[in-house]
Regions:
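Buried hydrophobic residues that stabilize the cores of well-folded domains
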Residues: 19-146
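Cytochrome P450 heme-binding "Cys pocket" and the immediately downstream C-terminal segment
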Residues: 16
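Sec-dependent N-terminal signal peptides
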Residues: 4-13
């Protein structure tokens, strides 16, 4: 009985890893396709902050495919890219530059399933955290909402 339960848990873990791996492969393909397209209609919106900011929306055939935000807040710059398919965020890249700390840069990557649940997160040190059932409470993991 113990061997049977152990085998069951092992199989669930392998299936979960396989599902995440398949989704990540799909995300990378969509990401490459989005970035290879060169004829986007780009809408720019200035954000009235004390240090400034901008939102750029990239449309292909009137469908929103990518959003880039840049915000300056005191001694930092926050740059984010949201990748969108079928109206939902599937990947987010976040780069924070700290000007007061020798221009230190911190990168984070967020991967989402088809329902915008965070399934994989890569922290600034490169550590990968993944869970097919969704990850909760990761700073900066918000999806794009217009």
């Amino acid at each position: 009985m113990k061997k049977m339960l152990l085998s069951l848990f092992l199989m669930i873990g392998i299936c979960s890893f396989s599902t995440i791996r398949q989704r990540i492969t799909e995300i990378k393909k969509d990401y490459a396709e989005t970035n290879s397209y060169k004829s986007y209609r780009i809408e720019k919106e200035r954000i009235d902050l004390s240090e400034g900011g901008e939102i750029r929306r990239y449309y292909k055939n009137n469908v929103l495919r990518k959003v880039v935000t840049e915000f300056y807040t005191g001694h930092t710059k926050q740059y984010a890219e949201y990748y969108i398919k079928n109206g939902k965020t599937y990947f987010k890249y976040l780069l924070t530059t700290y000007f007061y700390n020798g221009n230190k840069k911190e990168e984070k990557r967020y991967y989402y399933d088809n329902h915008e649940n965070l399934i994989r997160y890569i922290d600034p040190s490169g550590k990968i955290i993944a869970n097919e059932n969704g990850l909760k409470d990761y700073e900066g993991s918000e999806v794009w909402e217009d």
